[in-house]
Amino acid sequence: MEKTFDKSIFYLFIFAFIIILFILNNSAFNDNLPTCNNFVVNVYLYLALSICSIAIFSYLINYVLFGKSRQYYRPLELYEILNSIGSPFYIFSIIMTFVLIILIAFSNGFDNNNVGYNHVIWFLFLFFISVTIYPKFKDITTYNYVDNALLITSIIFIVMTYFYYMFSDLFLNNMSSIGMGLLVSLIVIVIVELINLLFFKRSQYFLSFFKITSYLVIILFSVFVSYDTAEMAIREKECTSLPNYPKFSIDFFMDILNIFSRTLFLKSTK
């Protein structure tokens, strides 16, 4: 049985985190304040920092829960993981994730003097969302597919980013209609999945239907990657001073997270 949370990978993420932090400090900040210089690069650096933070937090959570036991490397059943985390804290983490993402969404994008506050709520968001997705890395039914799901997610992200740059005029000239279409599609999928969960959970078709909607979610958030890339290009032109880079990186992060989660689900339920 393969082991989970190899410590050599943890050290690799620590090293990557430090390198990205060093580059970010030189690229995005001047006199400890964020600048508009290298705007696009800085957003991607914050995205990379977010991903490294999720990995580091997940390793730390695993160490806190199982560091002194043989279960540190072992994949476990989902109920064992949730019992170790504690259901109240897990639910609290889900609630805090939503609260913090709302706070980030309503923070100013530019001319934002609350640099420390912006980074604190962003870092707290990354911690609490790490708690909610940590079980996917430890669960005996999904852990073996994490690398594959990450690879597929990375390919989708790169391809859809390239797709925007190939057809940038298509997106930039139709931002409102594309954005509305994506929003309506997302709302419809959420409603349909809630109906499936509430009324058809015990049906023999529940899992098959959820697989279908998972493919739709992957397609939807793949388009979101291109749309958010277009948004970033617009924000770069609008930037005047003190950009809120944590806020701008969150959209890409959520795109990646949704694509990864659904890809992992589909891989683990073949």
Task: List the predicted regions and their residue ranges.
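A hydrophobic alpha-helical transmembrane-helix feature that marks the membrane cores
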Residues: 1-270
